[in-house]
Each structure stands twice: as structure tokens, then as C-alpha cells.
A protein has these predicted regions:
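Domain-level detector of nuclease and nuclease-like folds
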Residues: 132-311
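Polybasic, lysine-rich low-complexity intrinsically disordered segments
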Residues: 2-3, 19, 24-25, 39-40
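Short, Lys/Arg-enriched N-terminal segments with co-localized hydrophobic residues
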Residues: 39-52
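Aromatic-lined ligand-binding clefts that engage carbohydrates, nucleic acids, or primary amines
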Residues: 76-141, 270-272, 282-283
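N-terminal signal peptide c-region/cleavage motif recognized by signal peptidases
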Residues: 70-73
């Protein structure tokens, strides 16, 4: 009976309690409260079985320290750069400064300082009904892709959904991204967050749109020839090379901004991709540079490198 009770208490995952709390502050409170309650139950247990309380208290102190240093990480978002245009310029001039790192996220296409793309061998654009390549002009240059699409977090803002008294042009009111960008400071910060921006071939960025990432059937063909980016029925499966970066970006945005929240299925997929595809040196260097410019860290990336002693 006693051993079974101990097994249940020790097997309880405190972090699960925090998953349904809405904001990062609420998640921290939920997590801390749940784990403190677990420790109280353990005190009762040790009294019940008559173990040395002084030894238990020492172990409890160690456990509390481990909790503080646990892998449950809460990010703080961008509060310095409020212009999407400025964010793109800073990425181009202060982050992607070496030619070796000027490579697009999905198709590994190289590009120059003027954003001109060298398409990978075998890269193809899908064709329209007239047999012409779609977004041919945009395929020649890179664009800064929101990994978590602006629309997916923008819909949380009333200015996006309904407009605002200040969102009027030539006597006509407007809403959507243009309105949120004009009047909502939080949206401005989220849209300009450099951790969420990666270079992509313009045509790929256009066709990805605001569709969510997921796994498609194994026999689904690539949409772009040799670039293993698959887009079908408003669903997107990214190439293997991009999955770790995508996962850590989604997890960062989910932790940093209460306005954005992943679904349970998304969280499970991103946790899987994060574990399967660890960070590399460039992802670490990129995060360091952005932290210096933007003023906030990306703890999702940073925690992995600190664990490996590489930060």
C-alpha cells in the first residue's frame, strides 16, 4: 500500500498541470503550485512511514533547486523592435552577415546580399491551369518568412478581426493585418520578432501561406521538385532539414506571447520534431545575434546549448 502510494506521487508530472493555463505567468504559477503540493504530500508520506525528516528536508531542498532549473521554460517576447521592415533589415545586415549562412530555410537555396536566389538543382515551381509556373518572379528572390504565420497570431487581436476607429483610409474603414499593424503595439512586436523570421524563396513563402505544418502521407509528392516541401489542401509538410528550427520557433512563440497558443496536437508534433532534430551551431549563433539586437533571449534554443555546454 505504502510503496504504491509513493509510486503514484513520484510518477506525477507537475508540468502537465501547466499546459492548460493561458498565459506564461499563469503557467508558471500552476506549475509551481502543483509541484509544491506534491512535496507537501511527500512530507506526509515520509511521516507516515517514519523516515528521518532531516534527511528528507535536505532532499526536498535539492528537489526544489532542480525544479527551478528544470527544462520547463518560459520565454519573454520582443519588446524592442516594432517595425517589420526594420526587423528584416537587421536580419540582413547584422545576423546573416556571412555568405555561408545565406541559405533558405526550406529548400537550402543560396542567395546573395541583394536577396537574389540561386535555385537548387531540380527545384521546380508548380504550374497553374495554363501550364505556367506560379509566382515565377517571387521565386527569384528571398522573402522573410514568418514561421508562425502573422495571420495565425494576428486573429487573436480585435483590430484584425473587427477593425479600429483609427483604421480608416479615404473614408473607408479597414481591418485585418493592416489595421493591427497600425494600432496594436503587441502585434507590432510579434510581427517584428526576429526569432520567428527566416529567409525563404519568395514563391515557397507565398504558397505556404498561413497553413499549419503537419505530416502528410508518405506518398505525397513534393510541390517544388527536389525541394521536399509538400503543400496539399492547405496542409504543409516541411523538409526534414527545417523541422527542428520550425519546432523550436513555434515553442518560443507559444511561450513568449499569450496572444498565441498552439493546439494540443501542434504541441505534440513540435515536441517530437524538437527532440528528433537538435540545434546546430548556426541556430545557436543566430539566436545569440538576435538576442543582442532584440534584447530578449530564446530559452528554447539556449537551454539545449547550455545543456551541452556549448553556449
Amino acid at each position: 500500500m505504502k510503496s504504491r502510494f509513493l509510486f503514484v506521487v513520484l510518477g506525477y508530472d507537475c508540468s502537465k498541470v501547466a499546459k492548460d493555463c493561458d498565459t506564461k505567468n499563469e503557467r508558471y504559477f500552476c506549475l509551481t503550485t502543483a509541484c509544491v503540493l506534491r512535496k507537501i504530500v511527500l512530507v506526509v508520506y515520509f511521516c507516515w512511514v517514519g523516515l528521518d525528516m532531516s534527511m528528507f528536508l535536505k532532499r526536498a531542498a535539492i528537489g526544489a533547486m532542480a525544479l527551478m532549473l528544470s527544462s520547463t521554460t518560459f520565454a519573454v517576447g520582443n519588446e524592442r523592435i516594432d517595425s517589420f521592415s526594420d526587423a528584416k533589415k537587421k536580419l540582413e545586415n547584422q545576423v546573416y552577415t556571412e555568405a555561408v549562412n545565406r541559405v533558405t530555410i526550406y529548400c537550402a537555396a543560396k542567395y546573395d546580399q541583394r536577396k537574389n536566389v540561386t535555385r537548387p538543382k531540380g527545384f521546380k515551381l508548380p504550374l497553374n491551369r495554363d501550364g505556367e509556373p506560379i509566382h515565377e518572379k517571387r521565386a527569384k528572390r528571398i522573402e522573410w518568412e514568418h514561421i508562425v504565420p502573422a495571420e495565425n497570431f494576428g486573429r487573436a487581436f480585435i483590430e484584425w478581426r473587427e477593425g479600429h476607429p483609427l483604421c480608416v483610409e479615404k473614408g473607408k474603414s479597414f481591418k485585418g493585418r493592416k489595421c493591427a499593424e497600425k494600432v496594436n503595439r503587441t502585434f507590432q512586436y510579434m510581427q517584428a520578432d526576429m526569432y520567428n523570421l527566416y529567409p525563404a524563396i519568395g514563391a515557397v513563402n507565398a504558397l505556404r501561406s498561413n497553413y499549419n505544418f503537419q505530416l502528410l502521407d508518405a506518398d505525397t509528392p513534393s510541390t517544388f521538385g527536389s525541394c521536399e516541401m509538400k503543400i496539399v489542401d492547405k496542409k504543409v509538410e516541411p523538409p526534414v532539414r527545417a523541422r527542428g528550427v520550425i519546432a523550436r520557433t513555434y515553442k518560443y512563440m507559444d511561450g513568449a506571447y499569450p496572444a498565441y497558443k498552439m493546439s494540443r496536437a501542434q504541441k505534440q508534433l513540435m515536441d517530437t520534431w524538437d527532440a528528433q532534430h537538435p540545434v546546430d551551431q548556426w541556430e545557436c549563433t543566430r539566436a545569440k545575434r538576435i538576442e543582442k539586437i532584440q534584447g530578449n533571449e530564446n530559452p528554447i534554443v539556449k537551454a539545449q546549448y547550455q545543456k551541452a555546454g556549448l553556449w
